[in-house]
Amino acid sequence: MGLFSFTQEIAIDLGTANTVIIHNDKIVVDEPSVVALDKRTDKLLAVGEKARLMHGKTHENIRTIRPLRDGVIADFYAAEQMIRGMVKMVSSKSHWFSPSLR
């Protein structure tokens, strides 16, 4: 590591019910582990609470997924999209540098 670090280090706790992201010993994201995807394109539409609110109340072409079951990743694509979406929540709160994914 050099004199200046232009990245943020974060910790992610993937849970079956909630996903938590910690930065500088503070919880910065605590959202339900849910994603909403377009059935036709597999495009990510919503993550976390926004996706949970869409469950059962949206168009038939939108599906909500809980990517973790019994503490294990059950849908790798949905889990990846969920992590990417939640990391974006962290970087939107910090205007300088994006988080470092390791």
Label for each model-derived stretch:
Residues 7-8, 32:
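Short, surface-exposed beta-edge/turn micro-motifs
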Residues 16-102:
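Conserved phosphate-binding loops in N-terminal lobes of ATP-dependent enzymes
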Residues 9-13:
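Short glycine-aspartate micro-motif
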Residues 1-5:
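A short acidic-Thr-Gly-centered motif at the start of a beta-strand
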